[in-house]
């Protein structure tokens, strides 16, 4: 009987840990999706920086680190591509990482680009970002589409 009780307690502990991990991943995903909307679609720099941690590391070689780097990028979008729009096609979370698959269109009536954005969070704040960007070609070698 005691061994069954120990097994039950262990099983409940594992289940509770998994539920907490799922809740954290979902919260991280929602944070990144909200950030993406205010930063890239609304282009609201002040709202966007509230989602960043004290230190924000940017791995895109065209963007600077920190809140000021993000503000500069958002200002660039406001100035050069005020009608740009980003549609998140997929959002995946794994621990402290959130990955987005995005259709980004900088100018209306263009094909746009496919983007994979990877974010790392600490304590619910975005602290690191990577991306890979690919133009959507006029003609593809297959009919699968990029999304």
Enumerate the predicted regions with their spans.
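Bacterial N-terminal signal peptides
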Residues: 6-16
């Amino acid at each position: 009987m005691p061994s069954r009780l120990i097994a039950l307690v262990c099983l409940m502990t594992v289940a509770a840990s998994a539920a907490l991990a799922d809740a954290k991943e979902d919260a991280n995903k929602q944070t990144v999706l909200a950030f993406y909307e205010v930063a890239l679609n609304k282009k609201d720099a002040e709202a966007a920086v509230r989602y960043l941690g004290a230190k924000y590391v940017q791995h895109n070689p065209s963007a600077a680190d920190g809140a000021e780097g993000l503000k500069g990028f958002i200002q660039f979008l406001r100035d050069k591509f005020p009608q740009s729009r980003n549609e998140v096609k997929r959002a995946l979370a794994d621990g402290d990482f959130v990955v987005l698959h995005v259709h980004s269109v900088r100018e209306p009536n263009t094909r746009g680009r496919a983007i994979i954005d990877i974010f790392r969070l600490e304590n619910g704040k975005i602290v690191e970002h990577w991306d890979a960007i690919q133009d959507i070609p006029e003609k593809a070698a297959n009919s699968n589409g990029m999304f």
